């Protein structure tokens, strides 16, 4: 996170506006501008654990990772700089949360790439902080307004759910496949055998659908789930609870907070970080799996067929096999053997 994103570069064109401001940074924080911008004081709130990791090293306790921001997170701030995410319901959850805490009269800045739909911020905030576009550069828009009225915010109102077979899947804005099971996960699920036993880790668990479906027909599995996303962690916990299933669920940047070894690691790894295509998480998953699999343990992942994972699997484990595929997706399987690179 050394290079600035286009959105941050647009903000830097207005750096003089923030020198005497007490700024809260929030939203899709994909670089370390919150730690580097010259302000009277800076705080940050993020729902993404990997963003928190980067900023925490430079900002300490003034950056917080959680699903919902609290009053202490915006303490004494008079300015919000909000990075618009690609997901509009996610933006609504976060902005209603933050604006319900900031004092009336606060300066509100919203910045984002045009293709992310940042223009819809004007309509979303019209009742609370009418926005004007103050800059357009680097294919981004920067909007400014003042908070005229605090919205009421009820996090419970943002929960959704859908049914998969006999399972109830709980979801929140920002969680992958919020509106139903995606095709890739469906293909991976079709390969999971009933009566699986042992310790299973679901990396990038989303709403917890893979782990819940596995446990529903393999009651002897011991589940561990992790994700970088606070909404995903909370949704997975709620999914397990709704179906009477047990499991350990926590935030982790791939394996950063994972301890121990497992008999199976399953994942539908992301390859989009915000609007950018990123293979880093999936490559870290494959390479790091050797340190978290028992001998004979299995890594099973689903991915878009065009992604270059076979090479990484072969470099790391010595081999791989494709156990299911469609025109768009493949399910890869490999085993922890002595030839795997530890």
Curated annotation (Swiss-Prot):
Q: Does the keyword Cytoplasm apply?
A: yes
Name the Gene Ontology molecular function terms of this record. 16S rRNA (guanine(1207)-N(2))-methyltransferase activity; nucleic acid binding
Keywords assigned by UniProt?
A: Cytoplasm, Methyltransferase, rRNA processing, S-adenosyl-L-methionine, Transferase
- Annotated compartments: Cytoplasm
Q: Which reaction does it catalyse?
A: guanosine(1207) in 16S rRNA + S-adenosyl-L-methionine = N(2)-methylguanosine(1207) in 16S rRNA + S-adenosyl-L-homocysteine + H(+)
GO CC terms, sorted = cytoplasm
Q: Disulfide connectivity?
A: none
Concerning InterPro entries, the annotation shows: DNA_methylase_N6_adenine_CS (IPR002052), Mtase_sm_N (IPR013675), rRNA_ssu_MeTfrase_C (IPR023543), RsmC/RlmG (IPR046977), SAM-dependent_MTases_sf (IPR029063), Small_mtfrase_dom (IPR007848)
Question: What would be one Pfam family of this protein?
Answer: MTS
SUPFAM superfamilies membership: S-adenosyl-L-methionine-dependent methyltransferases (SSF53335)
Q: What is its main location?
A: cytoplasm
Tell me the superkingdom of the source.
Bacteria
Q: What is its EC number?
A: 2.1.1.172
Q: Which family does it belong to?
A: Belongs to the methyltransferase superfamily. RsmC family.
Role this protein plays: Specifically methylates the guanine in position 1207 of 16S rRNA in the 30S particle.
| PANTHER family, alphabetized | RIBOSOMAL RNA SMALL SUBUNIT METHYLTRANSFERASE C
Q: How does it assemble?
A: Monomer.
Q: Which HAMAP family match?
A: 16SrRNA_methyltr_C (MF_01862)
- What name has this protein been given in UniProt? Ribosomal RNA small subunit methyltransferase C
